[in-house]
Amino acid sequence: MQLPTFLEVYEGLISTSSISSTDPSWDQGNAKVIEKLATWFKDLGFHVEVIEVESGKHNMIARMGEGEGGLLLAGHSDTVPFDEGRWSFDPHKLTEKDNRFYGLGTADMKGFFAFIYEAVKKVDWSKQNKPLYVLATCDEETTMLGARHFTTNAPFKPDYCIIGEPTSLVPIRGHKGHVANAIRVTGKSGHSSDPALGVNAIEIMHEVLFAMMQLRDKLIKEYHHPGFAIPSPTLNLGHIHGGDSANRICGCCELHYDVRPLPGISLDGLENMLRSALQEVEAKWPGRIDIVPLHEPIPGYECQHDHPFIGGVEEICQTSSQTVNYCTEAPFLQQLCPTLVLGPGSIEQAHQPDEFLSFDFIDPTIDVLSKAMVKYCC
């Protein structure tokens, strides 16, 4: 059987749209790209299972070899939406120009599966003693649905995991989490000529904002991680809107904020800190303050710096591991085994018009992955 080339796999991935979005008009599901991946890895000798997580949303688990432990190579099969007017190329066509691959998902991160595919072909598997797994998840760009489902229902426990997000081939051992909420204040509208007729939601929100800024200062004062460029959690007040007219008492005001917690700060603990910060305001204005999540919260993640897995991958890559501020599926997969984030391309290209991956990453990435397969499976 003639196996597809690296370029053919890459082209097939990029040409198969798999956008996930909280906007139903954009959301497509990933069934078609998972079907392609399943076929390719079956032809390569893997045992493949496709799991429907929700309607139109699928994970793929591929396994080569038997036994306990082994190495899991993971990534998400979905992409973000795109602004067609800002692209110079067809987002759903792999374009080669100026020693780059252009296309939606070239860096973030469908292209990673083409690198896995090619690396498998380079390895002598006659001495394999532990399994190699490949996981392709759904909805990383929205709810992390695929990673959450896999972690809860994992049919195996690998020794180690590498997630192929674009890190410029630098091993990432930790990142902050992400929590985004809306605080909605409900007042009572009325004519501005008589403030006693209503309850001004903006005035209540003023008290909420003061409490949130106190929480921000508390997070900076009490939590510190020297491994991060920004060593404390961050709290950002990102969006606020209230009222509809200068001559009307504001009946509703809404604030959107986010927190990026450090590894080790539990989501429950962060929620308790928020409730404590707002306790006095809520007691003063009972029933008028609601907190609504904008998305499922993502905890911080860290693979312990002295873990031998980090040293082994640093040796393969010939570079030291780092921490970053953006989020991946690592907090979930880390629940199963020591996990690192490591892949081709730059995070600066993610979610951008004319997303690309430089040809400079091709050979080094295949080399790194094939060495990892040998080290942890053979």
Curated annotation (Swiss-Prot):
Zn(2+) 2 binds at D108, E141, H351. The gene is argE. Homodimer. GO terms for cellular component: cytoplasm. It comes from Vibrio parahaemolyticus serotype O3:K6 (strain RIMD 2210633). The active site is at D78, E140. The keyword Cytoplasm applies. InterPro entries: AcOrn-deacetyl, ArgE/DapE_CS, Bact_exopeptidase_dim_dom, Peptidase_M20, Peptidase_M20_dimer, Peptidase_M20A. HAMAP family: ArgE. This is Acetylornithine deacetylase. Catalyzes the hydrolysis of the amide bond of N(2)-acetylated L-amino acids. Cleaves the acetyl group from N-acetyl-L-ornithine to form L-ornithine, an intermediate in L-arginine biosynthesis pathway, and a branchpoint in the synthesis of polyamines. It comes from the Bacteria. CDD domains: M20_ArgE. Belongs to the peptidase M20A family. ArgE subfamily. Gene3D superfamilies: 3.30.70.360, Zn peptidases (3.40.630.10). Pathway: Amino-acid biosynthesis; L-arginine biosynthesis; L-ornithine from N(2)-acetyl-L-ornithine (linear): step 1/1. It catalyses: N(2)-acetyl-L-ornithine + H2O = L-ornithine + acetate. GO terms for biological process: L-arginine biosynthetic process. Zn(2+) 1 binds at H76, D108, E165. Its main location: cytoplasm. Pfam families: M20_dimer, Peptidase_M20. Keywords: Amino-acid biosynthesis, Arginine biosynthesis, Cobalt, Cytoplasm, Hydrolase, Metal-binding, Zinc. It is found in: Cytoplasm. GO terms for molecular function: acetylornithine deacetylase activity; zinc ion binding. Binds 2 Zn(2+) or Co(2+) ions per subunit. Its EC number is 3.5.1.16. Its cofactor is Zn(2+); Co(2+); glutathione.
